[in-house]
Curated annotation (Swiss-Prot):
It is found in: Mitochondrion inner membrane. Belongs to the cytochrome b family. This is Cytochrome b. One of its GO terms (cellular component) is respiratory chain complex III. Keywords: Electron transport, Heme, Iron, Membrane, Metal-binding, Mitochondrion, Mitochondrion inner membrane, Respiratory chain, Transmembrane, Transmembrane helix, Transport, Ubiquinone. One of its GO terms (molecular function) is metal ion binding.
């Protein structure tokens, strides 16, 4: 009699995905982030569901309802901070996951990579709308500034903005629809994650060497289940430290002031995980140019498979490309820092230089370096 795990229509899908899946024997801790992102998504959906039970999507009561959750609901403070800081962990892991993909050439799995980029857009949209819901000062003004960017679209822009707002400014209608979208998007993301995994399992996982590993595979369980559980424990430790010791470390103090359309905060800025893109947006004086640069700064990820000119897949044996990749990381850290600074000298110039460097490294230097390395190896 065949094992139920291998014959049952539903259980065998789980079996082929997480138990009997043949995995490369040499994948490092950089391959842990996929499972960590899955855990983060589950955590966000569960905590979000409990928050939605007590939250009211109305401009007059939204801020008070969040305060009520923190003060009066049993462990409400824990749920709220787990959700807020869980989002930060989500983005840390997302950026590590994408960085891993760039470093080890995982983007050559075209379908998996492109679904991944769409997932990034969906997660960014969800996080942005979630930031609006507490209806603090930064929520309101962040929503106003970011939605206003759409007015840069020629001809239909201003109409589009008013259509999204549901009026002539960010108000009750905007908050209600943002809550609706913020609730539904994580489920759409979950479906997209399944497609992401479906495409990944068509090809099998990449590995640090970038070479075909068909000749040396090991079962996912117990080897990588144990490894993933260890990663989850480390994540739980970091997240609990953040929630219990400094829950507001990554937040903005302005969001503890209720939204006031008559009083603009001195420095409007998004959450830390959007600062790099915000810095690129601000570095271009023209409104439409800034919006295009902002969108392209993420969309550029889709060009990676086309820009891969090296004869080797991974950067493991390409020291020159490795240097560029780490320069790109440093550049993104600089952009993140600049995004949080006021628009004044010398930050404007640094931001413009860092933005130019970002596009130059990806579009010009990395492909050139790949060709140079091919020449050095006489390929």
């Amino acid at each position: 009699m065949t094992n139920m795990r291998k014959s049952h229509p539903l259980i065998k899908i789980i079996n082929h995905s997480f138990i009997d899946l043949p995995a490369p024997s040499n994948i490092s801790a950089w391959w842990n982030f996929g499972s960590l992102l899955g855990v983060c998504l589950a955590l966000q959906i569960i905590t979000g569901l409990f928050l939605a039970m007590h939250y009211t999507a109305d401009t007059t009561t939204a801020f008070s309802s969040v305060t009520h959750i923190c003060r009066d609901v049993n462990y409400g403070w824990l749920i709220r901070y787990a959700h807020a800081n869980g989002a930060s962990m989500f983005f840390i892991f997302l950026y590590f996951h994408i960085g891993r993909g760039i470093y080890y050439g995982s983007y050559t799995f075209m379908e998996t990579w492109n679904i991944g980029v769409l997932l990034l857009f969906a997660v960014m949209a969800t996080a942005f709308m979630g930031y609006v819901l507490p209806w603090g000062q930064m929520s309101f003004w962040g929503a106003t500034v970011i939605t206003n960017l759409l007015s840069a679209i020629p001809y239909i822009g201003p109409t589009l903005v008013e259509w999204i707002w549901g009026g002539f400014s960010v108000d009750k209608a905007t908050l209600t629809r943002f809550f609706a979208f913020h609730f539904i998007l994580p489920f759409i993301i979950t479906a997209m994650v399944m497609i992401h995994l479906l495409f990944l399992h068509e090809t099998g996982s990449n590995n640090p060497s970038g070479l075909n590993s068909d000749s040396d595979k090991i079962p996912f369980h117990p080897y990588y289940t144990i490894k993933d559980i260890l990663g989850v424990l480390f994540m739980a430790l970091a997240l609990l430290m953040l929630i219990l010791f400094s829950p507001d470390l990554l937040g903005d103090p302005d969001n503890y002031t209720p939204a006031n359309p008559l009083n603009t905060p001195p420095h409007i800025k998004p959450e830390w995980y959007f600062l790099f893109a915000y810095a690129i947006l601000r570095s271009i004086p023209n409104k439409l140019g800034g919006v295009l640069a902002l969108v392209f700064s993420i969309l550029i990820l889709m060009l990676f498979p086309s820009l891969h000119l090296s004869k080797q897949r991974s950067m493991s044996f390409r020291p020159l490309s490795q240097c560029l990749x780490w320069i790109l990381v440093a550049n993104l850290i600089i952009l993140t820092w600049i995004g949080g600074q006021p628009v004044e000298h010398p930050f404007i110039t640094i931001g413009q230089l860092a933005s130019i460097s970002y596009f130059c490294i990806i579009l010009i230097l990395m492909p050139t370096m790949s060709l140079t390395e091919n020449k050095l190896l006489k390929w």
